[in-house]
C-alpha cells in the first residue's frame, strides 16, 4: 500500500529531478523571480502553497537525506528579506526512493 507521505515525497522529488543537474532553486519566501517558476507552478498545480512546498523540501532534506541543499547569497535587487537562494539536488538515495515508489505503483496497478 502506498502511503500519502510517500506520495508527497515522490512528487516533490520528481519536481527536483525535473530541474536536472542544476537543481531546483527557491527562496525562503515566495517570489516572482524567474528561477522560482518551477516551484510556483508546482504549488499551483498541486493545490498547495509555496510555504508548504518549501517546508516539504527542507523536511525531506533533513529527515531522509534524499536531497542535497546548498545556499547562495542573492544579490538581486528584489532579494529583500529573502536574501538566500537555496538549491536542492537529488541524491542517489532520492533516485532510489523514486525507483522503489514507481515499482510499487506498477505492482499496485497489476492488482
Per-range role (PLM):
Residues 7, 30-33, 85-92:
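Alpha-helix boundary/N-cap detector
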Residues 23-30, 75-80:
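Intrinsically disordered, low-complexity Ser/Thr- and acidic-rich flexible linkers and loops
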Residues 34-51:
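Short helix-coil junctions and helix-kink-helix linkers
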Amino acid at each position: 500500500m502506498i502511503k500519502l507521505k510517500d506520495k508527497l515525497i515522490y512528487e516533490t522529488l520528481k519536481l527536483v529531478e525535473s530541474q536536472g543537474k542544476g537543481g531546483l532553486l527557491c527562496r525562503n519566501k515566495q517570489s516572482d523571480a524567474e528561477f522560482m517558476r518551477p516551484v510556483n507552478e508546482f504549488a499551483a498545480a498541486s493545490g498547495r502553497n509555496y510555504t508548504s512546498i518549501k517546508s516539504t523540501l527542507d523536511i525531506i532534506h533533513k529527515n531522509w537525506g534524499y536531497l542535497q541543499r546548498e545556499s547562495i547569497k542573492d544579490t538581486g535587487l528584489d532579494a529583500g528579506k529573502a536574501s538566500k537562494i537555496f538549491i536542492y539536488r537529488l541524491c542517489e538515495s532520492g533516485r532510489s526512493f523514486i525507483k522503489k515508489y514507481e515499482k510499487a505503483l506498477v505492482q499496485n496497478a497489476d492488482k
